[in-house]
Amino acid sequence: MPMMSYAQNREDVRLARAFAGRNTGFYVDVGAHDPVKFSITKHFYDLGWRGLNVEAAEGLARKIREARPRDITLNVGVSNRPGSLTFFQATADAAGLSTFAHDEVERHRAAGFRFTEHQVPVTTLAALAAEHIHEPVDFLSIDVEGFEREVLEGSDLETFRPKIIVVEATRPLMTEQSHGRWEAILLSARYRFVVFDGLNRYYVAEEHADLAAALEVPPNPHDDFIPHEYQVQIDALRQQLDDQSLPIRVARKLVSATAAVSRFAQRRDR
């Protein structure tokens, strides 16, 4: 059966190669956003994995928590020190732009996007790992719309050591790469850069360098996957066809029933 890919840029396809045959594992998703749409972890959860989801938007965190009872889902932000920060939450039609990064918000506002502001408690990745993670971490995903450096500055990558780290590496709604602000943190922690996929940069811990080969090749027909958004459209079209064909099916049944009644009446009259 083909793999169902939910991630925006097929990140889950590359990761599925790296962890082929694994029905259990542990992931950390900082900036989890949604339990299904563009989720880098949905495929793995469906296999039997579990993990830690961090989402600063209260409604989205609640949605993830309801959909993922095996997971730990926290409604907090992640930064380089604990405390409280202003979270800029975009309107629902652009929810993926929500961020703690003030400079990115100003650019988006100039382009016409609207945000509401909330004070949200923040902690560090190191503190989250110490409190909630008690097993090896297979992969970490960071998708925080311009706040990557602060997240990585608050990590302890010698103690909390995911095998693979995937970081969104372009500025929101731009092709400009942003890794110059934060990549040195990963390299100094003995992570090796593997590949840039046009949106994200992938890194492997040097002691797991054997996983790099599985990440290097772009998703392709050999991966045997179906993009979830395509499946949604297919299912919707099937439903439309079913709805449109209902009158035809009813008419056919009516004709069949009428013919049966007519035959019965003819036999009765003989």
Stretches found by the model and what they are:
Residues M1-R270:
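Phosphate/nucleotide-binding beta-alpha loop and adjacent structural elements of enzyme active sites
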